[in-house]
Amino acid sequence: MCGDRGSRTAPSAPSVDGAVRAGRPGVRAMTTNPPGTKPAYSMRIRVRGPAAATVAAVVADAPGTITVHSDESDPAGDRRITLDADGGPTLRWLVGALRQRLGADLLLAEDLVFAAASTGKLVQRACAATTTSHDLALSDADADRRVIDYLADHPRHVDRFTGRSRRVALLTDASAVLDFEPLAPEAALPAVESQALHLHLATGLDVVPLPVAARDPGDLATAIALLAPGFAATVLVHTHLHRVDAARAALGSESHLLLDTVNDGLAVAATAAVLGYLRARGVTPGRARVAVVDPARGGDLAGMLVAVGVGDLTLYDPVEYGIQALHRLAADLDLIVDLIGLAAPPPGVFVLRARPETPPPLAAATRGPRPLHALPGLLRAAVTTRRPITSKARVAAVHALVAATPPGALLPALDHPRLAPAVAAAAIEVLAAGR
């Protein structure tokens, strides 16, 4: 549901050298990218047909790795070429070299990351007809007055006669956005809009990205409570865990559905990856020896591992014990769950990388956990049953993920069409039973 350039003009986006124009990104399937390059450092150019040879020469001279992702001719005989670089320095060099060597033959250059960001990634669409005067009257004051009058007497029917049941607030206070220090809320929008896009695609729900200026957990809880009447559920994303926990505590027994990307996403997916790894090696959970490095970063991950039956669980604080003690411990372990991003993990033992700030690429998420493995299904379950997610529902989601994982992988692919429905069905069964 990206914006249509025919109906919307995207603002000029900053480029790697300050002059690359914004445009509309191409749509890509979820396929693995060539090694050595990163689509997050990509550009699309349009050049006159004969200039394609010069582009090839520039790519060959690059100081880093550049791959030609696509190369197509248009009806005018011009060439549209998408180039992926291995990082910022190579991309900056590429832009400068193309401008210098192509001159007027370079008809367009756009940074695909900023082009995609400038669309907002999601747009609203009208559901009610507005073609005739009769259509318009159904969304005018007299019609609204009738529905409001009814809902004032039947408040439990709000979800039946409004769009609230399909609407989700994706909230952040920008306190934990990727590797950044706390940000101004609006600066978090690109990350929140991306998450809204993926959640919408996986659930079909209308997901609204909402950065909020919350100075402390109390402000965050207040924002959630103030917005709750308009949404079926709220999902906290890119928000520090201690603020998530404090906001939950402040809200208390409020009936509004509140999920977060760590407890209802990453922790569930990481637990499923642990079980998948143990299963592939013929180790039963009860006999497994697992260490979680920096467990405070994983939300209820430790509780989830205990709940699925891991028999020997070590919670390892690298600040208190350092790294050498972990190396000495490694020989007795089946697996390490790394939540901090160990620079030199112990050899000889499998390390599951699960640092929240550095998730695996979407197209390679069969090798490591992402919140999107579990969160869409659990969100669907919560909205469908109108019940908060419980520990038992998360455990059911873990087993659904394990069952959907193909041989040789730790987790199912994120674009598996039955992934979210399978997780949702497992959680709904538990929630509907009141567990």
Can you describe what each PLM-predicted range is?
Residues 171-172, 179-180, 217-265:
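Phosphate/diphosphate ligand-binding glycine-rich loop within oxidoreductases
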Residues 113-146, 246-256:
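Helix-enriched interaction subdomains in cytosolic or periplasmic regions
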Residues 2, 26-114:
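A conserved regulatory-domain signal marking ACT and ACT-like small-molecule sensing domains
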Residues 39, 130-133, 171-183, 197-209, ...:
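Gly-rich Lys/Arg/Thr-decorated short loops/hinges at beta-loop-alpha junctions or inter-strand turns
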